[in-house]
């Protein structure tokens, strides 16, 4: 059966920033590439935060998440990799030639010489409020992500959470909302130090260590929340027009252990400096992996992807160059440069 399937040099599971940049670099190394993505579109976790401003990608000014996805997707498609969406991979096996055969939940099958895992923390699912009947407010003014900041202009906003996104949303909403109240279970926030400092210096009301314990409303719309101090038990009712919840995400990575991959803390895949896992021809990049020099920034995932791809290239072609030539030596880029110069001359 496997001989009927098209064989790819590299298959990347995951279409977030790590997966997209790895697909681009795979084209630079002249490898036949396929990207498998669980969602209906590329973007990964950033899809949940399209309005979030990203500051830490080298060479880019502060960029909205949605814009970064668009730019990465355009770059990823430079060498025309095959992209398959709605692919939840459930089965991993080897054929008689030691190629890797992947099967998706919908029955699609994919054959590849090497595999790069760029699945982040697994299929991302927001952690929702564990408050009875909270789901009925999701159609009105209970939010688990911020699609457009203008939705909250002039409103009294309560934000529950203390991670990067909660802090970023607070900073973004303070200038346009009537009021912003941040409720967090801990005294310490998990966001970047500078962003946390900016939030604390703003007019946002910050309540720690507090927990959101109840939602109040008429019909399907919240008009107030109850919060509780976790040490004293003191309760306060706060009137609000919108509630934003960011309690992090959970992802299912159990399938990886079923495949025999060595996992460390939090289920992350252990790799060496070449991004090699304990399985031949299988590599892991981005948030999914852990290694001694790991940098947990988007820029760090790009480096992971480059190193994994170089290892995959040598796995397939042991006599190949260890790294790609600089982009100015790539024939495809020379063609693209001519197109850009032609457009610029008009």
Curated annotation (Swiss-Prot):
What family does the entry list?
Belongs to the ferredoxin--NADP reductase type 2 family.
Q: Which domain of life is it from?
A: Bacteria
* Name used for this protein in its record: Ferredoxin--NADP reductase 1
What the record notes about the co-factor is: Binds 1 FAD per subunit.
So which cofactors does this thing need? FAD
Instruction: Supply the InterPro entries for this chain.
Output: FAD/NAD-bd_sf, FAD/NAD-binding_dom, Fd--NADP_Rdtase_type_2, Ferredoxin-NADP_redctase_2
EC no. given is: 1.18.1.2
Binding of FAD, residues:
37, 45, 49, 89, 124, 287, 328
Q: Which organism is it from?
A: Bacillus pumilus (strain SAFR-032)
Q: HAMAP family in the record, alphabetically?
A: FENR2
- List the catalytic activities from the record: 2 reduced [2Fe-2S]-[ferredoxin] + NADP(+) + H(+) = 2 oxidized [2Fe-2S]-[ferredoxin] + NADPH
A UniProt-annotated Pfam family: Pyr_redox_2
Whom does it interact with, and what assembly results? Answer: Homodimer.
Keyword annotations for this protein? Answer: FAD, Flavoprotein, NADP, Oxidoreductase
| A GO term, aspect molecular function | NADP binding
Keyword Protein transport in record: no
């Amino acid at each position: 059966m496997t001989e009927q399937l098209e064989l790819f040099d590299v298959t990347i599971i995951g279409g977030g920033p790590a997966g997209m940049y790895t697909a681009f670099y795979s084209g630079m190394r002249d490898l036949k590439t396929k990207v498998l993505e669980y969602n209906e579109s590329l973007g990964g976790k950033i899809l949940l935060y399209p309005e979030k401003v990203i500051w830490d990608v080298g060479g880019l000014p502060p960029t909205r998440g949605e814009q970064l996805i668009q730019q990465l997707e355009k770059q990823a498609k430079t060498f025309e990799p095959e992209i398959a969406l709605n692919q939840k991979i459930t089965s991993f096996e080897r054929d008689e030639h030691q190629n890797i055969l992947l099967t998706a939940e919908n029955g699609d099958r994919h054959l590849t010489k090497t595999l790069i895992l760029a699945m982040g923390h697994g299929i991302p699912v927001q952690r929702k409020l564990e408050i009875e009947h909270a789901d009925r407010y999701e159609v009105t003014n209970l939010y688990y992500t911020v699609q457009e900041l203008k939705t909250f202009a002039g409103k009294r906003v309560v934000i529950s959470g203390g991670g990067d996104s909660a802090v970023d949303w607070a900073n973004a909403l303070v200038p346009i909302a009537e009021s912003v109240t941040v409720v967090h279970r801990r005294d310490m926030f998990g966001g970047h130090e500078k962003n946390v400092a900016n939030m604390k210096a703003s007019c946002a009301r910050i309540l720690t260590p507090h927990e959101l314990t109840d939602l109040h409303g008429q019909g399907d719309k919240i008009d107030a929340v109850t919060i509780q101090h976790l040490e004293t038990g003191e309760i306060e009712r706060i009137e609000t027009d919108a509630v934003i919840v960011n309690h992090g995400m959970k992802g299912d990575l159990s399938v990886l252990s079923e495949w025999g991959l060595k996992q460390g803390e939090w289920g992350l895949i252990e790799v060496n400096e070449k991004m090699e896992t304990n399985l031949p021809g299988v590599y892991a990049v981005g948030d999914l992996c852990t290694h001694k020099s790991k940098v947990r920034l988007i820029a760090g995932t790009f480096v992971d992807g480059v190193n994994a791809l170089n290892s995959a290239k040598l796995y397939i072609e042991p006599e190949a160059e260890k790294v790609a030539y600089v982009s100015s030596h790539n024939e495809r880029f020379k063609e693209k440069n001519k197109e850009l110069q032609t457009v610029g001359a008009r």
